Amino acid sequence: WSGNAGKVITGVGVVNWLHYDPLTDDYLPIDYRIWDRERDGKSKHDHARDMFAKALERDFCPDWVLFDGWYATVALLKMIHRAELWFFTRVKKNRMVSLVDQQGVYQRVDALGWSDEEEDTGQMVWLRAFGWVRLFRIVRRLPDGTKRTEFHMTNQLQLQSRTTAETVLGYRWKIEQFYRELKQLTGVERCQARKQRSQRNHIHCAINAWLLLWERARRLGITVYEAKRRPFTDYLRERFGMPTAYRRPHPV
């Protein structure tokens, strides 16, 4: 399932956590899991929780934990909240919530009424089986000109700025950028091997290749695309610029 596309798509079954620093615009994968339920019996939700627990063991303390609504299970939300961290995630429109003045009376997220003030500040709601969250409604214009209404929630109840909320949510798109670069630059989807171990090794090597390109790009102040293309470009310039380049002799 792709939260970006809003439908099931064909892709690599990899779940990963990405660290992003908005001050330097650096983004790096800190952990990943290959989804293979038949092999280990774990769902993508299980992998997400395992990686979050491992990140805490490694003393990661991010300002925000961002993820798609597909992973917004009560179990993961509670893990993040108990770790005293702030999450911000998209919420499905059929999730049940209760208003401040109507506690115990639940309704779907998309059935809530919104005043002009609440459009800017969000509104406090009680998420069933979890607790208080601040909910924002954001209308996005899609490339085809249509509009899509999205709902996002956070446990940072003091956040009352839609502009700030959209800025924070924008950080989440770095995961899409990472996957796009991984696919376009490393051939992670083009493994020809049939053995499971070989396929896993291919994915691991592809991620390592991206890391090498990223390190070179940051060191030279260029993009990862240029970091891959430049060595070949420099070589071709050198060879084509040499008048004494080797030529096959004509047969006598």
Predicted feature locations:
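Single, function-defining residue in the core of a domain
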Residues: 23-252
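Active-site-proximal, Lys/Arg-enriched surface segment
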Residues: 1-24
